[in-house]
Amino acid sequence: MALTPEQISYRQQLVAMGDFNAHTLLPGEEWTRPENADVRHVLSLIPLTDIQLANRLDVDERTIRKWKSGETSMVFTTWCCLCWLAGLGMLLEEPA
């Protein structure tokens, strides 16, 4: 499924703010691992508590805290899920 116009606009606004790495929104091999600030920003866009998000992703709540602090890095598939939950579209799909 292609990105909606709303998702495209949302991504553009996020990147235009200047404190978000657009390369974290690229699919597959082109993807750049998000920095701590990118992770915190995307997590702040998700309308779930840390406990709810941990349950949704089947991870421990401590893992969410470690992502926020930068103590633990994130794999691509988890980042895809977070971006999807934040309304940024699904990164697993190749652009049209």
Outline where the language-model segments fall.
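Short intrinsically disordered terminal tails
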Residues: M1-L3, L92-A96
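Charged, low-complexity surface patches
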Residues: T32, V42-L43, E71
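DNA major-groove recognition helix of helix-turn-helix/homeodomain DNA-binding modules
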Residues: S73-E94
